[in-house]
Amino acid sequence: MLRSKLCLVLLLGSVVQAQAEGLATDKVRWHGFISQGLIQAPETNFVNLDDSISAELTDIGVNMSWALSDRLRLAGQVVYLDGGRRYTKGTRLDYLFLDWTLHSDFDWRLDMFVGRFKNQHWLYSATRDVPFTRNAIVLPQSVYFDSFRDIAVGSDGLAFKVTRTTSLGEVELNWSWGATNLSKEQSQILLSQLAQGDAEQDYVHQASLFWRPDQSAWQLGISLLDSDFTYEKAEQDYYSDGAMTVQRVMFNGRYAAEYWELSSEWVQERLDIRDFYAPGFTRNSFSQGWYLQGRYNLLPRTWALLGIDLFDLDKDDRSGRQFSASTGGLVPAYFAYQDDLTLGLTYDFKDNLRLTMEHHWVKGTARLAYPVMPDLQYNTSEYWQMWAMQLMYWF
């Protein structure tokens, strides 16, 4: 947290220094956002453990973009996030990278990013922490699993982006290689409080392709992910030394018209676990999920949201019966799936002041903490509900 606060001071200091030195305003730009809300998800461990209405729904951020030259740009953002038990609370360096434009002309452009960059491969992965850029307060958990947020949101490493304009429209290709450092708290959000050892992401390798047809409101895409993790147990630990491989294939589409829009993503994820639970243990499974969200402009400044989000922990065991049987019936079948119906309403008081409200009706608990250790104490119901409201301001 101290490192992130220092980065925030340096980021703000850079802006002040740049302005004091008389740099053109088009060279240095800074923006920010502040949001606060209320949320409740009874009978689950999603937000808290006492079923109460929680104010742990805070997003604050400040970002800067500094054009060092015509081809070189420095960009950074520091955020403070509080999502309750969904992910790590506190201040963090969201991104800080150099963007080097290697080539740019009328038809195509090539950029290289070095440093801590955002995940550009999914529809909302790069902006999921910026409240006014997403359709819902709580994103579809089949794809944007909150317990995995700190790993999925970005990486330290190298990335490239190529955009090409053709007679059929614009094509965008993204490639990245990097890793994310996991703190003890982040590891325990994934592995439960029983984890006393060190979890490490060895690497994450991603690629994505997007196509935006000419004179069309459509965007279609595909993305691939491959990542390895290792776990080194502590002297006194519930788990063993082990390794995991996560691989994803995703398809996505978005249609944005003047008064309505649709967005959807489909994912199949392979999880290969070696040892970890016990020496010699192996498990190889394929989960599947997808969501469809629609927004409609009901009235001036007012949008309605309808979404459906489905997830199955094992595509060959959608009912969860085999999963439950493998635990001797100790873990209910509803821990193997999670289906969500969402209704929401958004009202813009001003161009930069928005109130969003939503309600979720959920069946199953597969996307509640902890991914590798079902929480039978707090996730006690197959059917549960959640509501949230959030006021956001950006500048």
Predicted regions and their residues:
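Outer-membrane beta-barrel pore domains
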Residues: 48-49, 221-395
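Transmembrane beta-barrel strands of outer-membrane/channel proteins
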Residues: 32-40, 76-80, 112-116, 173-179, ...
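Transmembrane beta-strand segments of Gram-negative outer membrane beta-barrel proteins
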Residues: 22-45
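Short, solvent-exposed loop/turn and secondary-structure capping segments
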Residues: 43, 124-127, 317, 368
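Signature for the C-terminal beta-barrel architecture of outer-membrane proteins
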Residues: 101-102, 106-112, 148-292, 296-304
